[in-house]
Amino acid sequence: MVANIRETELSDFERVIGLLRQLWPDKELNRNSLLKIFSTCIRSPDNIYLCAEIDGHVIGFCSLVVRENLRVEGLVAHIDELIIDEPHRRMGFGAELLEAASAAAKKKGCKIVELDSAFYRQDAHKFYSKKGFEKKAYLFSKDLRS
């Protein structure tokens, strides 16, 4: 079975929120805040939001941010979220969505597509390595909300 990969629409929001709950099970999601960000990002030329669907049902989501980068002397696409619905994992849909995301980034003129992944997501790390991604750096983060 092959997924239909398409640009995300505002009407996909509720399903995407359900997928994000799987990606971040310990995070309390603020629906109103996320809706505002989601609706802005799907219209921005600096973002690529893709959904994977089977029989009209969204089973996957990927978001990328495109930006200029001095290191690569051009555009870089960063994958912020990539999630496949739990019952549909290990069926090739993640690979399809990742390939579509890479193709969309290339079409926008990006030289590199990159992502970060939590240390505990060992299966995801193996998946990304198999798909040609190389471990290049650690991500350091500082919370500025307090």
Walk through the language-model features, giving the residues of each.
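Conserved GNAT-fold acetyl-CoA-binding loop/helix
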Residues: 17-39
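A short beta-loop-alpha structural element at the N-terminal edge
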Residues: 2-16
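A short helix-loop-beta-strand connector motif used in the catalytic cores of GNAT acetyltransferases and
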Residues: 41-51, 78
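Conserved acetyl-CoA-binding loop-helix of GNAT-fold acetyltransferases
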Residues: 84, 90-103, 130
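Conserved beta-strand in the GNAT
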Residues: 51, 57-66, 83
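Conserved GNAT acetyl-CoA-binding A-motif
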Residues: 105-116
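A conserved beta-turn-beta hairpin within the catalytic core of GNAT-like acetyltransferases
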Residues: 68-79, 89, 136
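Conserved active-site alpha-helix within GNAT-family acetyltransferase domains
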Residues: 95, 119-137
